[in-house]
Amino acid sequence: MVKLNKDYTKLDEDYLFFEIEKRAAFFVKKSLCNLGIGDITLAIPEVITEAICSATKELQEEKTLRGYGPSQGYLFLREAIQKNEYINIPITEDEIFVQNGIKNAISSLQDLFCKTSYVAVCDPTYPVYVDSNVMAGRENIEYLPCLEENGFLPTLPQKNVDLIYICSPNNPTGVAFTRKDLKKWVDFAKKQNALIFFDGAYEAFITSDDVPHSIYEIPGADEVAIEFRSFSKSAGFTGLRCSYLVLPKKLKTEDGFSIHKFYKRHIDTKYGGTSYPIQRGAERCFTEDGKKALERNLNIYRSGAKMLREGLISLDYKVFGGTHSPYIWCKTKNEMSSWDFFDLLLKKAQIIAIPGSGFGRCGEGFIRFSAFANQKTIETALNNLEKVTL
Amino acid sequence: MVKLNKDYTKLDEDYLFFEIEKRAAFFVKKSLCNLGIGDITLAIPEVITEAICSATKELQEEKTLRGYGPSQGYLFLREAIQKNEYINIPITEDEIFVQNGIKNAISSLQDLFCKTSYVAVCDPTYPVYVDSNVMAGRENIEYLPCLEENGFLPTLPQKNVDLIYICSPNNPTGVAFTRKDLKKWVDFAKKQNALIFFDGAYEAFITSDDVPHSIYEIPGADEVAIEFRSFSKSAGFTGLRCSYLVLPKKLKTEDGFSIHKFYKRHIDTKYGGTSYPIQRGAERCFTEDGKKALERNLNIYRSGAKMLREGLISLDYKVFGGTHSPYIWCKTKNEMSSWDFFDLLLKKAQIIAIPGSGFGRCGEGFIRFSAFANQKTIETALNNLEKVTL
């Protein structure tokens, strides 16, 4: 009989967010303040749902029917992305790949590279980066500590590395790389001949000119970086599923292979494309009315993050992030562990948050709050928290 | 710099269907009779598009908004599948996993198993089975010849094998396994402790009671088989994207691991779920009005397959399949090679078909016609073909 790929046994039993669901399952869900998983809570603007319905109705007529779409995504969407997100940046529509979500894309892309590659990830980090590399049998993983003393920004790796995962604005810490910070990493990758996986899932939350939205704003990044973007957080597509990645044609492996070419081969074999009506919904995000509607929602989330951040500070918590990000990284009090603080929040304040240690060892002593919640939930959470004595 | 995963260099340059697109690109597309890639051509029934639009509109209201869905798919759809497709078969909703397409599911599932596993595939076969195993570094691939003399049904492997890919009704040959044929394989898998990947993408085309729709109709198959199904061909979802797989909890690896448990871990890490409105569209396929509408479309495709099959026979071609399948497997005349016949059909008869040799060595000398075309296209194709002198 077939044997298991033993690399799978090296994973934790459960994916982090399911462990949290399990623990929360003992409470009445409706009375809990969910500041846990980063899922959207504001309705999707009508301008977007209309675009999806209108595209769906095209399929009920033979003359406008569409079957299999291009595995790379429809040109209309790739052009809209290029024209709106990569103005004055040397990225062409042919370097954009539309997909079903960053999780799927970023966890599969590593398959293209040699199994003995050295990988650098931040600690704490989004668990998918590490888990997908463990599943692929990679053992050479360098964890880059992101600590209070370095402002939660990683320091450059000590060893030679081949693949570097960077997420900015960061999940879970909410901290964003400035242009200067990011340039240091692009220069390092060039010098080291390393490839950066740049996860920009939260770029819509950036509020300062000093923080780049795209890694390609840094000169030369198109020789060393692949960028991931999503409609999940910017447009509420967590349940609709649409994302994209940017893979410049200039990218070559050390052994001289075009990464673009092999990635195309990879998706042609392993990927059936993204739902057509959903791609039309994503396209609508770039029209004037689409942009306005999304901006209204983003502003509500931003206000929520501000309220949560300031509320926590007024309760004497030390907090980070929450400015360019929907996430607030909060230090526990009295050196309480992340999971103890999680249990306390759940039992005494009816709050779900995500224990920092779930994102890596260096996350111990912290908890992640998500501001994807309505104002009332955040207010209730802060009121409940005020009553908790530590 | 990161090096390429060298297993990728063992693949053909282009995925088969893109090579065909390239060759067809020199012709005016509108005047070609496309009997090539198996893509639907009939409009999607309104009852389905309505379900998708109605679910989409739920998302524009906060009280009916849904964000991230369960990675395994919504219970409403898994229950509908179980109640309609697995009546009197010991499969529970918890053993069903909703996904974006069989291609993605079947190409990823092999990741769960040991890299040195022995794989058996039919020759000819759907290229994704082989390519995904090559990408994973598997070198022990046994090709099972499916030839005219064995009715295009594979004979049992000579060596010990761990993973067996079976597609019935078959792509590309259009031939279906009877209950007796399939039982032989289930028994073999049991004896050998092998795991069967059973691709049932075309089960909706089965017209005889003698041909099982599900491998689990064979007693004991739930100990040795994973089944893949899709809404692509049965309901026209090629552009909408929805499929599912059935993974019984009884399945264990030789080393005693629960495949269900590790697959759940796999998708939790690597998969963000299927679009909610599309899952509602799929659910609607199982209502009375949904079933009727789909049956109408299927009957049109079936008539097309019959017309094409009979037309080819009347032109003295030797054909197989086309009864339980939208595909007709046609022998070339005068021992012409598959690609020569492809070029001839393209240049002299304005027909696109798929060269049999593209599906494997044993496909040489054959061509695959798809009956996913309207009646007029099939008529024109047959008329054009009649004029071709060989």
How would you name each of these model-derived features?
Chain A
Residues 3-101, 108, 285-288, 390:
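N-terminal small-domain helix-loop-helix segment of the aminotransferase-like
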Residues 20, 35, 52, 81, ...:
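Generic structural signal for small/hydrophobic residues in well-ordered secondary structure
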Residues 27, 136, 191-192, 315, ...:
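Helix C-cap/helix->beta junction micro-motif
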Residues 43, 301-302, 315-348:
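Conserved PLP-binding catalytic core of the aspartate aminotransferase-like
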Residues 63-189, 203-218:
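Conserved core of the PLP fold type I
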Residues 90, 335, 344-354, 358-390:
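PLP-dependent enzyme catalytic core of the Aspartate aminotransferase-like
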Residues 218-299, 306, 310, 388:
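Conserved core segment of the aminotransferase class I/II
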Residues 279, 283, 298-309, 319-331, ...:
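Conserved glycine-rich beta-strand-loop-beta hairpin in the small C-terminal domain of fold type I
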